[in-house]
């Protein structure tokens, strides 16, 4: 797939500006007025010299200061209007793009997050969007204002002496060729620089998020080396971009200087031959000099523009991702919780070996089924199919006899609760973490009842602010067992008929595990439960144990029956309890 053109990217960016067209139009008017005052300055000096200093017209000289003041007042007002209006549009553009990106992230399937590092996504939201703003607003300010300025000055030069001005136009094709070559180079370098910023963000995100592991295992030097490598790589690409731009700008300016030198030489000859006035010569020369500043800005804006367009490529690549497919039409208000897997198979993208193969399993309402197997056997993958984090490649999954693909995603997931060892808590109060999402309007009494059932009320009461206690990023102010019980309270409050427990009691001390296990027993009552556990002692009381190996079911039965079979489960059990 070919890369989008600059015109296409800029057109899409301007589409986000369209809702704010009034402020945008106001800024354009201000820019045009500001630019229009530029050629007025040399135009004022021609009659000043010819009429005031040569012809000694005192009446005209007295008007010149007033005209100059009026000119700069007009320029100042127009500049304020354009600057403020464009900044307003730019800030709205940043907000709208970030909102669109975040909304898209919330709608993307799980596989997208599995395939894209969080650091890259954070960099796109935080860094790339501001780069795009430079492209859509700041660059546009320069392009409009300075293009109008250049056109105005060129028009004035044509009016003064069209023959001399033709020299300027003769060098335009060469200038455009240089701009085209530089644009391609700058876009590629800007794209690489932004990718490196994403890598840098990823290193920081991992090192900060895993700071305890880093410190405990003495990984500081390794992480510092990773960061320095990423930072140096980002610096190298940035310097390549700067070097390309540093070469490109002087080349453009040298071309302009050639034109200026030729014009000055010819104009000086005309002045000595009395074919032009002093005022005409000074005005022409002054207008030529005034061309330098906007031309320099126009050549420099290409670097800024290409950085923004390179950033917009990554942003629109995200926005163009297909949202999670929701093929369902049914919204069952109540379900019994009967699950059935019918010849289910799944192969992850880019993998040759299937993660699951021909899985057939019936689970009765209220039954607790434990999924057991070595790492990579397919336990978590199988559980992830129930809420449709992934869809199977083959076969189907039924809920109360209905293919889950026929149930709306929101409705399906509304009937499922999840508690895992990787508890996700938000930097908010305990109450808001428990009454989360669809349960946001739960009453204090309902929240308290869920906390009591989860064996969490005692430690919550001991906190200074109770349920209003802020728990920090991912619940960092809570112990591991407390975090688990908050997650269980959240699941109890949801009161979903299907429950998935993914390693919910691993990595806990004995006291915490006792509390969590008691809370889980309360949670599992009258619910269809899938339990994933490496610690076989935690699932001995399951109604049924399903043993997976290589993505296939190799054994199924109760704990005692499977031990008596002396099969794969007995081997896993013996191996674990011999350690």
Swiss-Prot record:
One term of GO molecular function:
ATPase-coupled lipid transmembrane transporter activity
Protein family membership: Belongs to the ABC transporter superfamily. Lipid exporter (TC 3.A.1.106) family.
Q: Reaction(s) catalyzed by this protein?
A: ATP + H2O + lipid A-core oligosaccharideSide 1 = ADP + phosphate + lipid A-core oligosaccharideSide 2
Compartmental location: Cell inner membrane
Q: What does this protein do?
A: Involved in lipopolysaccharide (LPS) biosynthesis. Translocates lipid A-core from the inner to the outer leaflet of the inner membrane. Transmembrane domains (TMD) form a pore in the inner membrane and the ATP-binding domain (NBD) is responsible for energy generation.
> What is the topology of this protein in the membrane according to its UniProt annotation?
Multi-pass membrane protein
Quote the record's domain comment.
Answer: In MsbA the ATP-binding domain (NBD) and the transmembrane domain (TMD) are fused.
What does the entry list under GO cellular component?
A: plasma membrane
> Which top class of enzyme applies to this chain?
translocase
Q: Sorted alphabetically, which SUPFAM superfamilies does this protein's record hold?
A: ABC transporter transmembrane region, P-loop containing nucleoside triphosphate hydrolases
Q: What protein does this entry describe? A: ATP-dependent lipid A-core flippase
According to the entry, every stretch annotated as the ABC transmembrane type-1 domain falls at 25-307
* Keyword terms of this UniProt record: ATP-binding, Cell inner membrane, Cell membrane, Lipid transport, Membrane, Nucleotide-binding, Translocase, Transmembrane, Transmembrane helix, Transport
User: Which residue numbers delimit the ABC transporter domain?
Assistant: 339-575
Q: In which organism is this protein found? A: Thiobacillus denitrificans (strain ATCC 25259 / T1)
Pfam families membership: ABC_membrane (PF00664), ABC_tran (PF00005)
Q: Which residues cross the membrane?
A: 24-44, 63-83, 150-170, 251-271, 275-295
Q: Subunit structure, per the record?
A: Homodimer.
Q: What is its EC number?
A: 7.5.2.6
| Disulphide linkage map | none
